[in-house]
From Swiss-Prot:
It is a multi-pass membrane protein. This is Transmembrane protein 230. The chain crosses the membrane at residues 46-66, 79-99. The keyword Transmembrane applies. GO terms for cellular component: autophagosome; axon; early endosome; endomembrane system; endoplasmic reticulum; late endosome; membrane; recycling endosome. It is found in: Membrane; Golgi apparatus, trans-Golgi network; Cytoplasmic vesicle, Secretory vesicle, Synaptic vesicle; Early endosome. It is linked to Parkinson disease: A complex neurodegenerative disorder characterized by bradykinesia, resting tremor, muscular rigidity and postural instability. Additional features are characteristic postural abnormalities, dysautonomia, dystonic cramps, and dementia. The pathology of Parkinson disease involves the loss of dopaminergic neurons in the substantia nigra and the presence of Lewy bodies (intraneuronal accumulations of aggregated proteins), in surviving neurons in various areas of the brain. Changing residue 78 to L: In PARK; uncertain significance; results in decreased synaptic vesicle trafficking. It comes from Homo sapiens (Human). The keyword Transmembrane helix applies. Belongs to the TMEM134/TMEM230 family. It holds the Pfam family TMEM_230_134. The modification Phosphoserine is found at residues 15, 23-24.
Amino acid sequence: MMPSRTNLATGIPSSKVKYSRLSSTDDGYIDLQFKKTPPKIPYKAIALATVLFLIGAFLIIIGSLLLSGYISKGGADRAVPVLIIGILVFLPGFYHLRIAYYASKGYRGYSYDDIPDFDD
């Protein structure tokens, strides 16, 4: 007969608990702990990166046209700030779109976790 366990808090023996032996082939692991959950795709952050990329590209094109003289509304004194703002807006958009693209293709070292999310 198996000995009954004692509840330490009250000192009352508990005989209603049923015990069963584990299988000798069980190594203590379950399959679920090795399954990888699908990545959460940050759609809002990717949309924002796309908007930054497009606005930055547009400003770079406009700044280049202003600087070269195809658009004659002020010359170089207006072209340089437009180019600088275009580059500053373009770079983060390009960077995060590149990470999103490589993560979607499954390249090693890239994941959606590298893109900042809005915690919704």
